[in-house]
Amino acid sequence: MKKIPFLIMLLSPAFVFSQIKIGVKAGINFANITDVSGFKKDSRTGYMIGGYIAPGTKKLLSFRSEFILSRQGYNYKTATNTGNVNLDYLLLPQLINIKFSKLIQVQAGGQVAFLLNAKVDSTGSGGGSLFDYFKRFDYGLVGGAEIFPFMGFFIGGRINVSLNNANEEAPIGGSWPNYVPRVNAKNNVVQLYAGWRF
């Protein structure tokens, strides 16, 4: 009888783990910022890689937590040069997962993001850090869908819409790079990815 509690203690982590689904994924970003003045901007292709953890439930509704490394930003053209701005974020989405069938799932929710790096690659001034010109914290809404064609493999797409301004406020009359927004600009990202669910 004394062995029973010991066996329960040993088997409990395995039971809990069996009730949790883990997934990994990687893909491409089509990133841009909202309308700005002072320069022409265009969408930029980046990458995303990350994973998620979710309860292994068969219910219609469930929750999912993710962590994603995401390269975003934009291409730009001014009167004097062209280049691209790379904004690297750690995204932490918290999602409601709606399971329509074994093949199709839809996710929606919110996310917070932390800026890890900000750099420019310019024809006029070479490369350099832009970390002081962009906010360290972002937040917004996300929504998308995933298809599970076979086994644990899945493909998906998602739209990320930021609600916070990506750039810091430019000082009145002060110097400011002509390829960094002076007014409120927000990140917009479309993600396409593939992954595996364990």
Task: List where the protein language model places each region.
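Bacterial Sec-dependent N-terminal signal peptides
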Residues: M1-K25, A194, F198
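Outer-membrane beta-barrel channels and translocator barrels
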Residues: F17, G56-L60, S101, F150-G152
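Residues that define the transmembrane beta-barrel architecture of outer-membrane proteins
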Residues: I20, K41-Y47, N86-L90, K135-L141, ...
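Transmembrane beta-strands of outer-membrane beta-barrel pores
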Residues: I28-N32, L69-G73, V112-L116, I159-N165, ...
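Residue-level signature of outer-membrane beta-barrel architecture
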Residues: I53-P55, I98, F114, I147-P149, ...
